[in-house]
Amino acid sequence: MSLNNSSSVFLDSVPTNTNRFQVNVINENHESCAAGIDNTDPPHYEETSFGDEQNRLRISFRPGNQECYDNFLQTGETTKTDASFHTYDSHTNTYYLQTFGHNTMDAVPKIEYYRNTGSVSGPKVNRPSLLEIHEQLAKNVAVTPGSADRVANGEGMPGEEHAENKEEDNKAGAVKFGWVKGVLVRCMLNIWGVMLFIRLSWIVGEAGIGLGVVIILLSTMVTSITGLSTSAIATNGFVRGGGAYYLISRSLGPEFGGSIGLIFAFANAVAVAMYVVGFAETVVDLLKESDSMMVDPTNDIRIIGSITVVILLGISVAGMEWEAKAQVILLIILLIAIANFFIGTVIPSNNEKKSRGFFNYQASIFAENFGPSFTKGEGFFSVFAIFFPAATGILAGANISGDLEDPQDAIPRGTMLAIFITTVAYIGVAICVGACVVRDATGSMNDTIISGINCNGSAACGLGYDFSRCRHEPCQYGLMNNFQVMSMVSGFGPLITAGIFSATLSSALASLVSAAKVFQALCKDNIYKALQFFAKGYGKNNEPLRGYILTFVIAMAFILIAELNTIAPIISNFFLASYALINFSCFHASYAKSPGWRPAYGIYNMWVSLFGAVLCCAVMFVINWWAAVITYVIEFFLYIYVTYKKPDVNWGSSTQALSYVSALDNALELTTVEDHVKNFRPQCFVLTGGPMTRPALLDITYAFTKNSGLCICCEVFVGPRKLCVKEMNSGMAKKQAWLIKNKIKAFYAAVAADCFRDGVRSLLQASGLGRMKPNTLVIGYKKKWRKAPLTEIENYVGIIHDAFDFEIGVVIVRISQGFDISQVLQVQEELEKLEQERLALEATIKDNECEEGNGGIRGLFKKVGKLNITKPTPKKDSSINTIQSMHVGEFNQKLVEASTQFKKKQGKGTIDVWWLFDDGGLTLLIPYILTLRKKWKDCKLRIYVGGKINRIEEEKIAMASLLSKFRIKFADIHVIGDINIKPNKESWKFFEEMIEPYRLHESCKDLTTAEKLKRETPWKITDAELEAVKEKSYRQVRLNELLQEHSRAANLIVLSLPVARKGSISDLLYMAWLEILTKNLPPVLLVRGNHKNVLTFYS
């Protein structure tokens, strides 16, 4: 409610007996403006006694008008000085009270912000983003008070008026039903079927009044629990069309929804045939009585059924409005028929009816019929199985949820009331017919007996009839024998026949509409892509005409087959499977404890819903065990199919919520478990940047973390935080989606930082969750380090130092061509854009050539000129020109091949493990895990260790013993005894030439000059440093010679990473070590664990 200054608004109408604080807004006269600002009265407070329960405190605001406020702003007295502060505040408080939400960039809560894109209930509006209300305003931009916010809060929103008018037009054009016509009527018609008129009397005869009522109540319990679950799900958010399918799919996900939706739609389609055949059989019986058969009973049923289903199709195609009118008419007929039965029970019975077992209400008959009298082959559960389908139909209203004005209110109210009314009617009919009609009667008026003569002691005997011969020979009348008992008892028999017609036709019509609506919703979700054709709707109500035709074809086929006795149990089980899943959906959503599960309908319990699901499954087997098995098998195969296809939908199902809860519980439980070496697994940070830019680095890491460890692809955005955060946030979902699309079970994480090292340091400290915290850093080798800026080298080596500081293992991967293919991706993207533009240009020209009356070629060029279509040309500085000059395909071929080398099967070969230093076993564990993978399983492990020349055999035996205790299979062990000898002169000369540009050579200069150079270039390699680590430098050069000698042909080399002591070895010297160590080799993994055991030989 808005408070306008020009109108007088009083809030005195608010009930005062419940308020302790009341605000009275009283409009003052316009003359108050002329009096000046200082004359504005402050809020007036009226105190009341504490004994006054109606009001404790009243505040009366006396607002002025907008003109007064504008004049006040123009006076310039807006500064909050001591003299004016009170005046300013007392006056403008009123203004801000009236315009809250329109004087701030923040948007006030509106329903439009929470709609989905393309919502049928109204347009979606985007609220101002957090950046828009948080970032600094642009300079030299004048901001008028309140003007910046009118769009955000709905004033002057572009196209808003049009959208609202359009929404109103849509609402005016589409036919929407309330809870009575839309749900109550449909559910009652669907629940009241032919069972009410032709089977309920037989059920009372078999089970008796007592157990008959129990059967009705047990069936009602199943449907009532399902109704409660349906109501809870339907009130947990906006419900669209699709009925049971929509409720199940949005709760349990597309796998369950897609499988049950298809069989539910099919069951409704076949149910049309069942109801139509029931109608046709009744008509054929009437034709028999009048001797008016057309061909024979079977073919007459087919003819009448076909004509009937065509008429029903015509009513459905005419639109939901006509269908609803037909349902109302059928309900009226049905109610008259039921009332006709109850009236007939009090009309005195004649001799003919008495001979057929009807004696009006008799206590003796009630007592006799109260207990069961099951005939041969029948029992409680068999009778229950026959009655239960009569209680179904509770989803008839929910199935047209898209055509309801307010599904959240209509479905709970209409469904539960329909269950109650129909249950009362069933119980009433059962009790009445059981109190009026005996179980067996001959139908012969000659079976009367003289009063007082003892016969068989039955109730009929006491009423003057002897039906004892029915014990020895079959009789035609009575509850057990005559299916037309209700027609006999009723006041006017033909009305019961009309009721049967109404029950069958209304159920058939409801099933026809339900099948088409559910099927259309299923097809719209594109879960089964081949069925997309049936998703199209027509007219203002989006009528599924194609679905109607398909349902008609299915119904016609089963009418012509005329083998419904076989298919009927399966159809009943299909419905029960839907009920079971609806109950399980309600339980599952409650059990998942998702904050999004907050149904407005609170009369439900998750354990009751679970009991209902189990009860539905049990009833399925009670009705027909083989039909239940078939139902489960069909549903299972559809579930597997949908799971395999993985439809691209995200409905926030409870399955997703439970996955989160399960993961959270497991993660929390994991924190209580102490680390143990047997449970160690590599959990890796991988500095891939965008995962698509360094696929080879990700592939090799994923090879030893797949299904056994954690893999996080990390990217650091370096630069101004404002720009970096925007770029980072915009690409995170896309990069995670790339991992999913490429079936890589990994996570993507990104940070924004001022420098690369700070970003990685943040990742090293903060990534992971509890025990699921990465313990290994995987980085690519910096191939072009000699051309890189010094800061990049310092950051690169610093990252390795940081990892060791945090006790995290390090793996450096080197391949000959390098990892980064971002340039290739950029070129590919540019080429794709050019190709799209070229195709668009050709399509436009082709369209223009096809048009007539444009003056031939001249007209074509004129039109192209008007369209301003020109052949795109690349920019001067674009990557296209660069690639063209360097022959892009040939230039990048090796890089592209290298980027996919770890995706391929490696074939027979070796993984050479140079386990030179004991780091806890990570250098050995990673290659062992690789050999377990399908792509690496043909590669054998060859182990190389250092040793003494005079103890090679002993150390080889010791290593073999250790590996066998670790249960690691290996092909060979080599003990290298000459690691510490000096490398050859050529190798050492290459190393010296490589580090020459970075040496300080302070020994050749005087002391002052040397000290000055050290201060100016502290990053250079000093002679003292080089001399101190000369033996280590020899070792790196010598190791490369040994690697060239022994492992040149290996598929992969895993080598102990040398550690550079902080403060002793400069960054450039360390990079020189790594360069000379891995030069001219197959792919190399330099590995260094955190020196904590990752292998054990204890059980």
Curated annotation (Swiss-Prot):
Residues with attached carbohydrate: N446, N456
Q: How is its activity regulated?
A: Activated following phosphorylation by OXSR1/OSR1 and STK39/SPAK downstream of WNK kinases (WNK1, WNK2, WNK3 or WNK4).
On whether rRNA processing is a keyword of this UniProt record, the answer is no
Q: Which Gene3D superfamilies match?
A: Amino acid/polyamine transporter I
Q: Where is this motif: RFXV motif?
A: 20-23
Q: What is the topology of this protein in the membrane according to its UniProt annotation?
A: Multi-pass membrane protein
UniProt lists the family membership as follows: Belongs to the SLC12A transporter family.
Supply the name of the protein: Solute carrier family 12 member 1
Q: Which organism is it from?
A: Oryctolagus cuniculus
